[in-house]
Amino acid sequence: MTDQKLVTVIDYGMGNLRSVAKAAEHAADSNTRICISDKAEDIRSADAIIFPGQGAAKACMKALNETNITHALIQAATEKPFLGICMGLQVLMTHSQENEGVDCLDILKGDVQKFDLSGHPELKMPHMGWNQIHQTIDHPLWHNIEQNSRFYFVHSYFVSPHDKQIIAGETTHGKRFTSAIAQNNLFAIQAHPEKSADAGLQLFKNFLNWNGQ
């Protein structure tokens, strides 16, 4: 009998966890168990990690620090298949401009910047709704997802990684911005795959089948 695969969805009070967990469960096979947890031991024992998030960077970092899971989270982000979603992408960076400046997890070197929509009166903030992701690299998490597929976004800030080689996807809202990154065992996306219909479901399937390489 094959050992069951455990995927932990990290609960730190800042994500639509149920929607993410339900989408992952829908994508999972019978040998995969999805659990929601705020415990460091469940992060360490998991075979893969999903790190969702929504809200403001300062509140997210405060919540992470209060749950005492930061060390386990950083360790997992370098060791096992790891999927960051929305704010779960942004707080992986070094620093965010949000809330007058917030130090983030510094797992990935880079900054989080606010959209500048000057010259684009037709565009709104936040960037909300469906938009295309242009895949900039060939990656297992893009498997069976068509180029320029539409995903659902809700955000006012975007990541700017120092190493442009880790950019996995780009989207245009006034300007072209990084909407997905990939580095070793880690993949993170600005959009909400749990709200992104078939493309989002396929992304979850790809992640659950991914060995992190």
Swiss-Prot record:
Residue span, Glutamine amidotransferase type-1 domain: 6-213
Q: In which pathway does it act?
A: Amino-acid biosynthesis; L-histidine biosynthesis; L-histidine from 5-phospho-alpha-D-ribose 1-diphosphate: step 5/9
Q: Which PROSITE patterns match?
A: GATASE_TYPE_1 (PS51273)
Disulfide feature: none
Q: Name one Pfam family in it.
A: GATase
What's the EC number here?
Answer: 4.3.2.10, 3.5.1.2
Reactions it catalyzes: 5-[(5-phospho-1-deoxy-D-ribulos-1-ylimino)methylamino]-1-(5-phospho-beta-D-ribosyl)imidazole-4-carboxamide + L-glutamine = D-erythro-1-(imidazol-4-yl)glycerol 3-phosphate + 5-amino-1-(5-phospho-beta-D-ribosyl)imidazole-4-carboxamide + L-glutamate + H(+); L-glutamine + H2O = L-glutamate + NH4(+)
This protein's UniProt keywords: Amino-acid biosynthesis, Cytoplasm, Glutamine amidotransferase, Histidine biosynthesis, Hydrolase, Lyase
Q: What does this protein do?
A: IGPS catalyzes the conversion of PRFAR and glutamine to IGP, AICAR and glutamate. The HisH subunit catalyzes the hydrolysis of glutamine to glutamate and ammonia as part of the synthesis of IGP and AICAR. The resulting ammonia molecule is channeled to the active site of HisF.
Taxonomic source organism: Hydrogenovibrio crunogenus (strain DSM 25203 / XCL-2)
Describe its assembly. Answer: Heterodimer of HisH and HisF.
Q: A GO molecular function for this record?
A: glutaminase activity
Biological process (GO), any one: L-histidine biosynthetic process
| Cellular compartments annotated | Cytoplasm
Tell me which domain of life the UniProt entry assigns to the organism this sequence originates from. Answer: Bacteria
Tell me which SUPFAM superfamilies the record gives. Answer: Class I glutamine amidotransferase-like (SSF52317)
Residues at the active site: C86, H192, E194
Protein's recorded name: Imidazole glycerol phosphate synthase subunit HisH
Q: Which gene encodes it?
A: hisH
A Gene Ontology cellular-component term: cytoplasm
